[in-house]
Amino acid sequence: MKKEYRVKKDKEFQAVFTRGASVANRQFVVYALKKEQQTHFRIGLSVSKKIGNAVVRNQVKRYVREACQLHEASLAPNYDFVIIARNPAAKMTAQEVADSLRHVFKRSGVWKRQVK
């Protein structure tokens, strides 16, 4: 995922937290903030130290980025997303992460269409 497609600055994270809508399941919390001027969605990740050691946290982040790339065509383009991983995400495979995130994105209303 390209760096311009990531939410990186603290101000951007805080804007998504305060003005964005949140949807959650057991594995992830997703905050979504609509940005009309954007042509592509951006992703910010937060994985707590409670999830596990650095290896586990980095693996969860890689799986989330991979899932977002996989579902890139199905996500609304003009949103900033902040994805917070919960404890069960540490024991998930890449496919399970992708399925869980798809479920959360569908519930939040930013899913455009089915990917085959």
UniProtKB/Swiss-Prot annotation:
<comment type="similarity">
    <text>Belongs to the RnpA family.</text>
</comment>
<dbReference type="InterPro" id="IPR020539">
    <property type="entry name" value="RNase_P_CS"/>
</dbReference>
<keyword id="KW-0819">tRNA processing</keyword>
<dbReference type="GO" id="GO:0001682">
    <property type="term" value="P:tRNA 5'-leader removal"/>
</dbReference>
<keyword id="KW-0378">Hydrolase</keyword>
<dbReference type="GO" id="GO:0030677">
    <property type="term" value="C:ribonuclease P complex"/>
</dbReference>
<dbReference type="GO" id="GO:0042781">
    <property type="term" value="F:3'-tRNA processing endoribonuclease activity"/>
</dbReference>
<dbReference type="GO" id="GO:0000049">
    <property type="term" value="F:tRNA binding"/>
</dbReference>
<dbReference type="InterPro" id="IPR020568">
    <property type="entry name" value="Ribosomal_Su5_D2-typ_SF"/>
</dbReference>
<dbReference type="GO" id="GO:0004526">
    <property type="term" value="F:ribonuclease P activity"/>
</dbReference>
<comment type="function">
    <text>RNaseP catalyzes the removal of the 5'-leader sequence from pre-tRNA to produce the mature 5'-terminus. It can also cleave other RNA substrates such as 4.5S RNA. The protein component plays an auxiliary but essential role in vivo by binding to the 5'-leader sequence and broadening the substrate specificity of the ribozyme.</text>
</comment>
<comment type="subunit">
    <text>Consists of a catalytic RNA component (M1 or rnpB) and a protein subunit.</text>
</comment>
<keyword id="KW-0540">Nuclease</keyword>
<keyword id="KW-0255">Endonuclease</keyword>
<dbReference type="InterPro" id="IPR000100">
    <property type="entry name" value="RNase_P"/>
</dbReference>
<protein>
    <recommendedName>
        <fullName>Ribonuclease P protein component</fullName>
        <ecNumber>3.1.26.5</ecNumber>
    </recommendedName>
</protein>
<dbReference type="InterPro" id="IPR014721">
    <property type="entry name" value="Ribsml_uS5_D2-typ_fold_subgr"/>
</dbReference>
<keyword id="KW-0694">RNA-binding</keyword>
<dbReference type="Pfam" id="PF00825">
    <property type="entry name" value="Ribonuclease_P"/>
</dbReference>
